[in-house]
Amino acid sequence: MTDLSRYRNIGIFAHVDAGKTTTTERILKLTGKIHKIGEVHDGAATTDFMEQEQERGITIQSAATTCFWKDHRFNIIDTPGHVDFTIEVYRSLKVLDGGIGVFCGSGGVEPQSETNWRYANDSEVARIIYVNKLDRVGADFYRVVKQIRDVLGAYPLVMTLPIGREESFIGVVELLTRKAWIWDDSGDPMKYEVKDVPAEMADEVEKWRAELVEKAVEQDDEVMEKYLEGEEPDVDTLKRLIRKGTIKLDFFPTYCGSSFKNKGVQLVLDAVVDYLPDPTEVKPQPEVDLEGHETGEFAIVDPDRPLRALAFKIMDDRYGALTFLRLYSGRLEKGTTVLNTATGKTERIGRIVEMHANQRNELDSAQAGDIVAVLGMKNVQTGHTLCDPDKPATLEPMVFPDPVISIAVTPKDKAANEKMGIALGKMVQEDPSFHVETDQESGETILKGMGELHLDIKVDILKRTHGVEVNVGKPQVAYRETITRRVEDEYVHKKQTGGSGQYAKINYVIEPGEPGSGFVFESTVTGGNVPREFWPAVEKGFRSMLGKGVLAGYPCVDFKVNLTDGGFHAVDSSAIAFEIAAQAAFRQSVPKAAPQLLEPIMKVDVFTPDAHVGDVIGDLNRRRGMIKSQEAGVTGVRIKAEVPLSEMFGYIGDLRTMTSGRGQFSMEFSHYMPCPKNVADEVIKEAQERAARK
């Protein structure tokens, strides 16, 4: 087993085209894991191993890869850059100790880089920054450094400077050692020379080095005092201080290079060893009780403590189901039994494997700090905790956002219905942000996800991986309904047949709840007019109606009910009578409470060349968008807006047309807002027509 201080669990995250997968490939080549480097643009990269990824050139699934550099063990999680897969980024950040943020030397801080950066800040993940593609036309390292400061509000601690620009980029100057690394044109990462700094760069190097030293010495008062008295700290002291500041997130060591041309990647690997934390140097995971409240205990990273492991990804491949685990404490051994705290059931550990993209090495055991996959687990889902059955505990679970878009699918071949059901069951296990439901009335299968591309990929996986071709309906928006007026009302349910009948009377108030509150029920009944044992039945009755609002059948949210009074009959009253009364009361009173349709509003971040700004803003306005800000950069303008999801279908094609293929955008859910009357009327009309057809 590797000593824990030599572990680095890291993620590589970036915008779609910043060169993240290429960078991962170069790391694997340098660490001796692969012999021929795969290029993304010919669909052969090692970590992009789903067909959909290789075809689209974007990374969808976090492939876990283990490799070694300078006697340190790297577990690398390759994360996707497209916004519809942000769930994968969030999921991998949960299990990482550090990260490499890759930025494009010409594109700079692009919309998705900002989203991923924000997630990493929320997860308190220490990072180093790598500005890639400096061989590209228009690449400018110094501009990207300024953008990182201005747009991300982060402090990039510049560690290397580029030698040459664009096609004449030949290497980097390492500021700490004042040495120049210069590669030849062979493309071999090992063919480089370490020389003195080029004379024409000497002043620039000293300026940036002084800034580096001044920032580093702030980490230690004693070193700072000596520095102010004129004593320069040695390189080892500076490295110690940079490590301390990086782990505290005070700054982010920043490197430059070109992964495609194999220039500069070694220094990034050295930085992972020198500055990113080992598993014992990050905050331990809190343990929680069954209700999700913290117990005050922590999963300390120590192989000798009881087992605590988090299942952070489920994947199905040709060998069966793979469950990826991050071990926080204890050991996991082949043939032993562990407890899944989410299900209360035990699982036997069969084969443990260390993953290298889609290849694997079998292991007999794993320890705290490891990221491994286990084959053949039956009832484990993403976010479940596996622990020692004799000393159970639950780790803080992952929280996933609700889907905002849905499509109906039917198999082209009716005989494939069962096959589709099995395939979708596996896909839901693999991706908690993907939901599958059956429309009770039409019998159609409804897929729900985080965006158009997310669902496109799912349909593709059905076809390629599972051999099920489907007909796809047009995308549907996840509207919601609410009420806007307080209504005081009563309802009496009476049913008399032979024998005992049914009787329940309820007096109640329904009113709008706080935004985001969902459904709130309370009872202020006094004097026993509605016995306490029937209150839960009243709540259950109202709650059972929330799934289908009165306007267009969409779920009802932000809805408050207060049971104020009522009446009962000693013989005829029962829980079921009160439940039926509450259901009828919902149907009676909600139409009086000025019901309103709500629509999902998306945060949209668009990048466009200067020449097309007017067209893009005009188009967003036509889509009922509200422009929040626009920011001029060197290569174009970033526009941030809030736009209803219903207006954003097919936007990527329209944006490319408007900007001659150069525009980019990212989009994520923001909040729900009331629909304008004309939109609401149209949605309600469509819903009524759909209902009439069923």
From Swiss-Prot:
Main location: cytoplasm
InterPro entries: EFG_II (IPR041095), EFG_III (IPR009022), EFG_III/V (IPR035647), EFG_IV (IPR047872), EFG_V (IPR035649), EFG_V-like (IPR000640), EFTu-like_2 (IPR004161), G_TR_CS (IPR031157)
Molecular function GO terms recorded: GTP binding; GTPase activity; guanosine tetraphosphate binding; translation elongation factor activity
Alphabetically ordered keywords of this record: Cytoplasm, Elongation factor, GTP-binding, Nucleotide-binding, Protein biosynthesis
Recorded GO CC terms: cytoplasm
Limits of the tr-type G domain: 5-280
Record carries keyword Protein biosynthesis: yes
Family (UniProt): Belongs to the TRAFAC class translation factor GTPase superfamily. Classic translation factor GTPase family. EF-G/EF-2 subfamily.
Name listed for the protein in its UniProt record: Elongation factor G 1
